[in-house]
């Protein structure tokens, strides 16, 4: 699997969307480096959480549109935290939770398929059920991270019961949409390296 991930990573971009995704990925990396010197440690930590997602989407050989969507979504999600958009714009939190969890659930589908945790059945319901389950799990983990940050790092993190449940519902709905889309469209490039 490592060889396939490396092969996908080093494959040169071939389409405009792939070039744009790589540019966004580079911006994410540079942004974290700049943040390390210019922003508080908590903001740098939040921004650095984008890096695994933006790199993994390239390494998995996702279709260019999904790769770009992953990159943009996680950067918007982290950036919204740093510049406090979640408090400033009502509903932004739920929208970002839905979209971000949706794209990450799509990534999870590819990882679970590549590692043979799930076996393609040909049934359209499989990616719907698996993506929704993965999205709900990711939402729960994220809410635990938020709680941990609030409890042990800074009380400026907004954590309430209603916010937590709302975020998880939005994430679950986003993952459900991702599963429906995955049941109808291929998530990976046809020419990607596989295990």
Over which residues does each language-model region extend?
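Alpha-helical transmembrane spans of integral membrane proteins, capturing the lipid-embedded, hydrophobic core
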Residues: 26, 51, 98, 102, ...
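Residue-level signature of transmembrane alpha-helical entry/exit and packing/kink sites
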Residues: 22, 46-47, 94, 123-131, ...
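"…centered on the first transmembrane helix and the immediately adjacent amphipathic helix/loop
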Residues: 2-102, 106
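Membrane-interface capping segments at transmembrane-helix boundaries
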Residues: 183-194
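Membrane-interfacial alpha-helical segments at the cytosolic side of multi-pass membrane proteins
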Residues: 99-116, 150-157, 172-185
């Amino acid at each position: 699997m490592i060889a396939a991930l490396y092969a996908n990573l080093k494959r040169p971009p071939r389409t405009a969307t792939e070039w744009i995704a790589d540019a966004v990925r580079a911006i994410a990396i540079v942004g974290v480096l700049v943040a390390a010197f210019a922003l508080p440690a908590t903001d740098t930590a939040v921004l650095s959480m984008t890096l695994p997602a933006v790199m993994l989407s390239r390494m998995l050989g996702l279709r260019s549109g999904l790769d770009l969507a992953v990159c943009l979504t996680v950067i918007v999600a982290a950036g919204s935290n740093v510049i406090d958009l979640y408090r400033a714009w009502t509903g932004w939190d739920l929208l970002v939770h839905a979209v971000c969890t949706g794209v990450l659930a799509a990534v999870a589908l590819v990882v679970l398929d590549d590692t043979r945790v799930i076996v393609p059945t040909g049934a359209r319901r499989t990616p719907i059920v698996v993506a929704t389950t993965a999205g709900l799990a990711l939402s729960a983990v994220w809410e635990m991270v938020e709680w941990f940050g609030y409890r042990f790092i800074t009380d400026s993190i907004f954590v309430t019961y209603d916010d937590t449940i709302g975020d998880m519902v939005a994430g679950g709905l986003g993952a459900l949409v991702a599963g429906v889309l995955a049941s109808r469209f291929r998530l990976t490039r046809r020419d990607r390296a596989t295990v």
